[in-house]
Amino acid sequence: SVGFKAGVKDYKLTYYTPDNQTKDTDILAAFRVTPQPGVPPEEAGAAVAAESSTGTWTTVWTDGLTSLDRYKGRCYHIEPVAGEENQFIAYVAYPLDLFEEGSVTNMFTSIVGNVFGFKALRALRLEDLRIPNAYVKTFQGPPHGIQVERDKLNKYGRPLLGCTIKPKLGLSAKNYGRAVYECLRGGLDFTKDDENVNSQPFMRWRDRFLFCAEALYKAQAETGEIKGHYLNATAGTCEEMIKRAVFARELGVPIVMHDYLTGGFTANTSLAHYCRDNGLLLHIHRAMHAVIDRQKNHGMHFRVLAKALRLSGGDHIHSGTVVGKLEGEREITLGFVDLLRDDFVEKDRSRGIYFTQDWVSLPGVLPVASGGIHVWHMPALTEIFGDDSVLQFGGGTLGHPWGNAPGAVANRVALEACVQARNEGRDLASEGNQIIREASKWSPELAAACEVWKE
C-alpha cells in the first residue's frame, strides 16, 4: 500500500519492549502507574513512554521523516507494586539524544511535562531517575560541594549549625541584623533568611543584606570563627536575582540562598554558575516541594527533585528531619540524603532507590535538617545525618527562654557533646538523653533549653 497507515493505534505495539536491553547512555525512569479501570498495565506503561518522548495520539506522516527506533522512549519492564491494588512500576528508557545538554528544565519538560494529565491513567508518580554519566558530565552541578565548603569555613568533623530568623515576616532590617548577630555570636555557624523573605515593604533586600553583613563580621571578629548568613537572592526576575547575588559578593559574605522550585530550574542554574564563578556558596530551600511530592501515588518523589538540584547546582538543600514537625521516613530520607552526598549510590529498593547512580565526581550537596527540631533531637540527628549535614534550629534557638544567644549556646553545646560522645564510641541512639543531661549540668543555657522542650 502507498503512503502510511492513518488512524489511532495502540501504544503498546510500538513503545512496550519487554526484551529491550537498556543502554548505558539512556536516562531511566521508574514511574508508579495507576491505570484507569480496564486499561492493561502494558498499555498504560507504553502510553507513558510514548507521551513523554516521540509519541502523539495518532499516526502522523512526518513520522516517516525520522527514525522512531532511534528516538522513542521504551517501556522495558513492568512490575506490580506489592500491597497495592492496580498499581505498577513502569520502567522507561529514554535515548540521550532526546535531551538538551546541561538543562534540567528540558529534562523535566520531556519526562514529566505532558504525561501526568493523561486520560488512560488514574494517577502517575515519578519515583526515581537514573541519570547516565554522559548526561551528568554536561552539568556544572553544585558551585562548590562539601569538601570545598569545609575548607572555606575551616570547620571539620561535625555537622554545621544553622538557624532561621523568626518571625519570618515583619522585622525591620536593623532588628533582623541584631537577631543574626546574637545567634552567630552564641555559637551557630549560619543563620538563614526565611524562604518568604525576598524584598518586601517592611524590609527591602539591600538594607537586610547590609545589616546582616555587619552582624556577620562583628560575630566573626568576636568568636574567631567563620560565620555565614544565607542571604535570600530569590526575586521576580533572573536579572534582579543576579543583581542581589552581585551585591552579596561585593559585601564579601560567604553564602547566598535560593528557592529553587518557586524560582525555577533555569534561574537556579544561572545562579549556581554565578556562585561558582564568584566564590559564593549556595543554600537551596525547597519551598513548594510538598505540592509535588506529598501524594503517594501522583506527582514526583522528592529524591527526583533532589537529584535534579544536584545537577542544577546548590551546596545545601533542605531534606526533612526524620524527627521534627515535618514528615519524613528514616530509610527513605537517608536514601536521598546519600544520593545528595555520595559519589556512587547502589540500587536499594528498601531505601526507595530504584537505580544505581554514578555521579562521576560531581560535587556533593549538604543535606539540611530543619523543621521543629530542638536540643533533645540532637543525638538522633547527629547519628542519622552524620558529619556532612547542616542542622537548623529556628524556634529551637530563638524560642530559648533567655534569648537568642543563649539559645545558640545551648544548641552548640548539645552538638559538641553529641559529637564527642560519638567519637568516644558511645551509642547515641540509646544513650542520647543521658548525654544531653550530662552536658546540661555544666551549661545553664542547655539546662534551660532542656526544661522548655521536654524530651
From Swiss-Prot:
Keywords on record: Calvin cycle, Carbon dioxide fixation, Chloroplast, Disulfide bond, Lyase, Magnesium, Metal-binding, Methylation, Monooxygenase, Oxidoreductase, Photorespiration, Photosynthesis, Plastid
Protein location: Plastid, Chloroplast
What is the recorded post-translational modification?
The disulfide bond which can form in the large chain dimeric partners within the hexadecamer appears to be associated with oxidative stress and protein turnover.
Q: Which residues bind substrate?
A: N114, T164, K168, R286, H318, S370
Gene3D superfamilies in the record: Ribulose bisphosphate carboxylase, large subunit, C-terminal domain, RuBisCO large subunit, N-terminal domain
Spell out the InterPro entries in the cross-references.
RuBisCO, RuBisCo_large_chain_AS, RuBisCO_lsu_C, RuBisCO_lsu_C_sf, RuBisCO_lsu_fd_N, RuBisCO_lsu_N_sf, RuBisCO_lsuI
GO cellular component terms? chloroplast
A Pfam match: RuBisCO_large_N
Highest taxon of source: Eukaryota
Q: Which residues bind Mg(2+)?
A: K192, D194, E195
What binding partners and quaternary form does the record give? Heterohexadecamer of 8 large chains and 8 small chains; disulfide-linked. The disulfide link is formed within the large subunit homodimers.
* Family listed: Belongs to the RuBisCO large chain family. Type I subfamily.
Report the protein's function: RuBisCO catalyzes two reactions: the carboxylation of D-ribulose 1,5-bisphosphate, the primary event in carbon dioxide fixation, as well as the oxidative fragmentation of the pentose substrate in the photorespiration process. Both reactions occur simultaneously and in competition at the same active site.
List the protein's name: Ribulose bisphosphate carboxylase large chain
Lineage of the source organism? Eukaryota, Viridiplantae, Streptophyta, Embryophyta, Tracheophyta
